[in-house]
Amino acid sequence: MRRLLFLSLAGLWLFSPAAAAQLPGLISQPLAGGGQSWSLSVQTLVFITSLTFLPAILLMMTSFTRIIIVFGLLRNALGTPSAPPNQVLLGLALFLTFFIMSPVIDKIYVDAYQPFSEQKISMQEALDKGAQPLRAFMLRQTREADLALFARLANSGPLQGPEAVPMRILLPAYVTSELKTAFQIGFTIFIPFLIIDLVIASVLMALGMMMVPPATIALPFKLMLFVLVDGWQLLMGSLAQSFYS
């Protein structure tokens, strides 16, 4: 009973004018250009909320999708479904994504974050300026056919230029282009390992060893070939160059 009385008194105090005056206000201030500048509390809330969209941004708006798909196809081509493990591939993909996206991140930092942290521009202007380098990166990797497809599905009419492409069309078109590019790279990776599989299977058939799994015999030859050509360096270097070629 005492606890209930205490909670009731505490609730009444919180809703009193004196307590409300001590709480920080969530206000916005008008700017000279006609916009609004939100208080630090609102900006912090928006920033923390935006962090929940970070995985989606990583998958949909960076080079991560192409890299992780190529790594998965490489593992299938080698015939090692559990080596390297998923954690290692994810770590490599994240680091390679960071290196590839570093010019875009630097431009966002210089053009958007620094002026916003110095209170030279509003949050809306910072968001607009920060989105421009990311849009330019995505447009460079997106095929015109994919843009036309999603523009037709959205009934938006013919696109007038790169600046007129809305994000709701650019995002799925970019992901579709990344999937196609990743599968093209994966096809190129599969060819030498497929030749090894065919040769090993033919040799085993000629020797009458039909009960021996060809994948077991072919695996060391695949690993030896991949190591001899310095496959990891070749693959990661080619992936990085594919975004700026």
Curated annotation (Swiss-Prot):
GO terms for cellular component: bacterial-type flagellum basal body; plasma membrane. Residues 1-21 form the signal peptide. InterPro entries: FliP, T3SS_IM_P. Its main location: membrane. Keywords: Bacterial flagellum, Bacterial flagellum biogenesis, Bacterial flagellum protein export, Cell inner membrane, Cell membrane, Membrane, Protein transport, Signal, Transmembrane, Transmembrane helix, Transport. The keyword Acetylation does not apply. GO terms for biological process: bacterial-type flagellum assembly; bacterial-type flagellum-dependent swarming motility; protein secretion. It comes from the Bacteria. The chain crosses the membrane at residues 45-65, 88-108, 185-205, 209-229. It holds the Pfam family FliP. It is found in: Cell inner membrane; Bacterial flagellum basal body. It is a multi-pass membrane protein. Plays a role in the flagellum-specific transport system. Belongs to the FliP/MopC/SpaP family. For insertion of FliP into the membrane, cleavage of the signal peptide is important kinetically but not absolutely required. This is Flagellar biosynthetic protein FliP. The gene is fliP.
